[in-house]
Amino acid sequence: MDLSQARAALKAARRVAVLTGAGISAESGIPTFRDAQTGHWARFRPEDLASPDAYRRDPDLVWEWYAGRYRDVLAAQPNRGHELLAELERRKGPGFFLATQNVDGLHARAGSGSAGGELVELHGNLLQARDELTGEVFPLAAPDELTLPPLSPNGQRMRPHIVWFGEYLPVDALDAAQRAFAGAEVALVIGTSSVVYPAAGLAAETLRRGGAVIEINPEATDLTPDATFSLRESASRGLELLLEDD
């Protein structure tokens, strides 16, 4: 498959599934998870802060770290890649499904999930917290009103609404993603190294059932040898190339 054939396949497809990773948000200035360790936090490994054990050991420290990341995310804006995926959803309607490994909420802010298709945040959302007792999810207060640790409306302490090291992805989110990729005529895999499972296995669901997988990533990944077509571009530029004739 070449670029013109990839464009034609995407244009003709009624069912499109998309997986995005950190690469698409890097263009909005969001550091990757491991790049985020600077300043005071440089002496910590991400695993030392983003795990159930870390939270049990020192919830205040974990919340201090997440509060900084929360402020960074709120200061960022969706980029052209986010906007193009929202536009693709508007074109495809209910046949469009987007699963993201990112926790920054930028896809939703760009309009994804509100134009007839579905958005699933596989790893949670930095802009939310959940009640430790009930599991109910609430939006975080504005940074200048945020107290740590935040409390739910019923006074229970809340934890970040994030899937931590050692935790499983939410079953309903993963099931929805697997169904969407299994039924997709075309799957786009954008800005991810394709090494973190189970998300990295989603493209195989599409290939197994005869669908096409189009990868967009600046460097080759573990998926590249199996992808139907692979673009060595940034997320935004790759999407522009795929959609420019529409």
Swiss-Prot record:
The keyword Transferase applies. NAD(+) binds at residues 21-41, 101-104, 191-193, 217-219, 235. Gene3D superfamilies: SIR2/SIRT2 'Small Domain, TPP-binding domain. Keywords: Cytoplasm, NAD, Transferase. The active site is at residue 123. One of its GO terms (cellular component) is cytoplasm. GO terms for molecular function: histone deacetylase activity, NAD-dependent; NAD+ binding; protein-malonyllysine demalonylase activity; protein-succinyllysine desuccinylase activity. Its EC number is 2.3.1.286. Substrate binds at residues 66, 69. NAD-dependent lysine deacetylase and desuccinylase that specifically removes acetyl and succinyl groups on target proteins. Modulates the activities of several proteins which are inactive in their acylated form. Belongs to the sirtuin family. Class III subfamily. 2 residues (Tyr-66 and Arg-69) present in a large hydrophobic pocket are probably involved in substrate specificity. They are important for desuccinylation activity, but dispensable for deacetylation activity. This is NAD-dependent protein deacylase. It comes from Deinococcus radiodurans (strain ATCC 13939 / DSM 20539 / JCM 16871 / CCUG 27074 / LMG 4051 / NBRC 15346 / NCIMB 9279 / VKM B-1422 / R1). The lineage of its organism: Bacteria, Thermotogati, Deinococcota, Deinococci, Deinococcales.
